[in-house]
């Protein structure tokens, strides 16, 4: 979102605001304080529909899921009226929606007030919010090629996912400098493992189990997430070439750029950041998330020979399959180069600029101010 805002600011003196749910409020305010403290961050009450891929209807009727869903349905109604009053007061020329449950009440309020909607869908499988709002949208940007979506072609454009400018290909010399900066041996290969901001317990446990195998061939940097950091710290001793960190607050692009191979979940933005880096990647998708969107994200790149996939089912049978796959790739310069080159074909360095153009074009077509 910040990348798109940055491009919008280049085109004129626009009044920009960012709306999010309460859970993301503190993080959003911190991000926008660094980017532009004049952009207000407003909080919208919202609720989500808990759906688990591959689970039965009976599973979803369990009180631990049913009651929170009913409660959050009420939150959506509250968020709708909250959004309605805020929009009646502000009357923006266009609303840019990035998906997620907080966008649903905002989108329906905008529809009622006839305020144009522009959507962006990062995942190869459209989320429920975007599927519900897409009939009302004036334009839609997608993170993956259009063949993975059912959006009307006259509305949709494949723009990619806006990523920060520091995600770009690095030279071998630059990567060695980054390894040295991070405290690793510049002459050894480096494996970076990340499960996203909250970490990924299944990936963490697999890496701990195969740590010795990996360290015999490469340096290893595990970004565990805050929840499991202390537990993993107790399970592992200090070793040359081993680094454990809960979270990378600044410089994630440099960490990923330094890596010779990255192991990650299938979050859409993370994958496009790695594509922008032309980074050889092994994806371990979370198969239980809503709609199976991580499985579908991963398949896009697997089909293009741009990444390798290891399923959680495979890990459950034998963690060593991950070690064999990582080491096998590291030992083949041809495979490393092939994966990086193929992944790089998905990079869209102008995604933020293209998305900003779509937003401004929508405003002009609706006869609103330029």
How should these model regions be labeled?
Residues 10-73, 159, 228, 311:
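Conserved nucleotide-sugar phosphate-binding/catalytic loop shared by glycosyltransferases and other
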Residues 13, 19, 24, 53, ...:
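Donor-nucleotide binding loops and adjacent catalytic segments primarily
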Residues 33-36, 81-96, 104-118, 131, ...:
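Glycosyltransferases and closely related glycan-assembly transferases
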Residues 38-39, 111-173, 184, 303:
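Active-site-proximal region of nucleotide-activated glycan assembly enzymes
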Residues 55-94, 112:
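An amphipathic, basic-hydrophobic alpha-helix
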Residues 93-94, 257-272, 279-280:
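Acidic donor-binding loop of glycosyltransferase active sites
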Residues 180, 328, 335-349:
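A short, well-ordered alpha-helix in the C-terminal region of glycosyltransferases
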Residues 348-370:
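C-terminal alpha-helical cap of glycosyltransferases
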């Amino acid at each position: 979102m910040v990348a798109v805002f940055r491009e919008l600011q280049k085109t004129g003196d626009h009044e920009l605001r960012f709306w999010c749910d309460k859970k993301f409020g503190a993080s959003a305010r911190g991000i926008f304080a660094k980017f532009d403290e004049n952009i207000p961050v407003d909080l919208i009450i919202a609720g989500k529909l808990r759906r688990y891929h591959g689970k039965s209807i009976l599973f979803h009727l369990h009180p631990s899921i049913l009651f929170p869903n009913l409660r959050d349905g009420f939150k959506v109604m509250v968020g709708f009226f909250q959004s309605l009053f805020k929009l009646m007061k502000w009357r923006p020329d266009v609303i840019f929606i990035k998906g997620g449950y907080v966008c649903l009440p905002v989108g329906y309020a905008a529809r009622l007030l006839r305020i144009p909607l522009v959507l962006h869908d990062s995942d190869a499988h459209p989320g429920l919010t975007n599927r519900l709002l897409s009939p009302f949208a004036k334009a839609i940007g997608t993170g993956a090629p259009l063949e993975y979506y059912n959006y009307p072609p006259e509305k949709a454009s494949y723009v990619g996912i806006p990523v920060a400018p520091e995600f770009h290909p690095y030279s071998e010399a630059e990567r060695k400098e980054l390894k040295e900066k991070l405290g690793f041996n510049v002459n050894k290969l480096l494996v970076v493992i990340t499960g996203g901001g909250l970490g990924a317990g299944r990936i963490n446990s697999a890496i701990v189990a195969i740590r010795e195998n990996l360290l015999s061939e490469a340096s290893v940097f595990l970004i565990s997430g805050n929840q499991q950091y202390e537990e993993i710290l107790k399970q592992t001793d200090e070793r040359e070439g081993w680094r454990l960190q809960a979270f990378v607050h600044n410089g994630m692009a440099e960490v990923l750029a330094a890596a010779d191979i990255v192991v990650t979940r299938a979050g859409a933005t993370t994958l496009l950041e790695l594509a922008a880096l032309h980074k050889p990647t092994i994806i371990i998708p979370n198969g239980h998330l809503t709609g199976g969107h991580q499985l579908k994200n991963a398949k896009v790149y697997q089909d293009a020979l741009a990444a390798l996939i290891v399923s959680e089912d495979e890990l459950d049978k034998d963690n060593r399959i991950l070690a064999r796959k990582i080491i096998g790739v590291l030992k083949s310069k041809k495979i490393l180069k092939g994966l990086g080159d193929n992944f790089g074909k998905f990079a869209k360095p102008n995604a933020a600029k293209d998305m900003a153009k779509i937003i401004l074009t929508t405003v002009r077509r609706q006869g609103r101010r330029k």
